[in-house]
Amino acid sequence: RLFTATIQRCLGKEQIADLMEYQAEITKDSFIKTFWNGYYLDDYVDGDYHNAEVRPNQIIAASLPYSPLDRRQCKAVVDICTKELYTPKGLRTISPKSGGYRPEYIGGQLERDRNFHNGPVWPWTIAAYAIAYLKVYQHSGESFIRRLLTGYEAEMSELCIGTLNELYDGNPPFKGHGGMSYAPSVASVIEVCNTLA
């Protein structure tokens, strides 16, 4: 059930809870009709144009406790993100199969700005990925998620001592860039650890 409907039911407000559940179902249906392309979620929709580039935004929808996606759709999203976006440092911002893939965060400000959302890895995506992965694969996915955390060990003990960068190149050796001690990156790894605890 929708979180707010659950709260309303706890407060004894059944009519409000029913209305919220009804509205949530309409929203879910609209979300699926708009973004689900039969295989995974489109990145964005503009009128009749559906951008089907594989990007990590869709993992957030799959990770939500009250996701608009059913179990089969969540699995499809997790699987496409694993196949095309997953790296030892997190999820790439776009699939290497995309024509706009720019894995390195290098060059002048203009080039770095252009590349920022088109190939580098954002570690902050790893918490949503781990939560969605465990939602789909449950206990059988725990060993994979534990191994996922080892991708940060060298970074935290040798390079960015005790912390993580804002982003990493999308291809090996996954060199770190951007802000050091980037709070969303660190918080995401901590959230994964807490999820496994």
Cite the ranges covered by each PLM segment.
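C-terminal substrate/ligand-recognition segments
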Residues: 104-141, 190-194
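A structural signal for short secondary-structure junctions
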Residues: 55, 122-126, 145-146, 183-184
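Catalytic cores of carbohydrate-active enzymes
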Residues: 2-98, 102-103, 154-186
